[in-house]
Amino acid sequence: MLEVIKNRRSIRKYKNAPVSREQISEILHAGMLAPSSKNRQPWRFIEAAGAAKEEVCNVMEKGISREKISPFIPDSRPYITGAEHTLQIMRQAPVIIFIVNEIAASFDKTPTMDERVSEICNAQSIGAAIENMTLTATELGLGSLWICDTFFAQKELSEWLNGELYAALAIGYAAENPCARPRKKTENAIEWRE
């Protein structure tokens, strides 16, 4: 397992090669096996390939265009270019998995304290599911990219998905072999208390 963790990379270039339904099913099943707070399993995974992927990418493009004019995310303008680049990656990848929080509070309202705690727990649970999926993709010889730039089209994508979008995952055969990214030094990341 440690070797898979060490070898996982964020892939931003994909080959024009199909990914089998069996491979995607295995990745999705790994996500479903993730631990979750109070075993709530807040996730719903929506796989988009082919025409559905093209349609949802068009939805994201419309959301990014709207964000430029009428921002949903305050002060988002400096990051729009990154979201547009991510959209091109999504168009290139053969499969996109969208992760929806089935028990989320709406992004449009201020959460109560209970809802805020629940959202923190749900975010941790969904993060564990996504990590399981990225590691399984790596183990299967596939590349993946954990995508959060979908928030620039949060309203549009959540409507298309019929649920509160949390993140997305691009999946495909890597057309690049990036080096490991720098990590914090152990002494800056780990504190021992005994």
For the regions a protein language model found, what residue spans apply to each?
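Small-aliphatic-rich amphipathic alpha-helix that forms the alpha element of a beta-alpha
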Residues: 27, 31, 97, 103, ...
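Glycine-rich phosphate/pyrophosphate-binding beta-alpha loops
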Residues: 35-39, 170
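Generic beta-strand structural signal
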Residues: 93-95, 140, 165-167
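Glycine/small-residue-rich phosphate/adenosyl-binding loop
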Residues: 46-126
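Solvent-exposed alpha-helices and their adjacent loops that cap or buttress functional pockets
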Residues: 37-38, 89-91, 139, 160-162, ...
